[in-house]
Amino acid sequence: MRNFIKFGLIRVNGESMAPALPAGKILLVKFISAKQVKKALPQLKINQIVVITAPNYPDIWQIKRVKRINLEKNEMWVEGDNSQSTDSRTWGYLDSKNLVGKVVWPNK
């Protein structure tokens, strides 16, 4: 599924991005292929909302906000808007291979 670039709709499930993206909100996502993920990391912007896989749940997509990017190590630091979110404050930096896509709309 991740061998090409495509767009899709996903529904927010959970409160980690509340209040900006409450549970049930529909998002338009530009999915990033596994081949393009290293090239996509330098194009990310701080505070951009992304879809990632977490180290502890690699089969579950999560929505987070990019807070830091380490291009030398090909890593990103992501956090949920909700302070109770499980994110890089728990996991540390995520490898670029955990990047699934970028939220295109809404782009809060």
Residues of each region from the PLM?
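Extended hydrophobic leader/signal-anchor segments used for secretion and membrane insertion
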Residues: 1-108
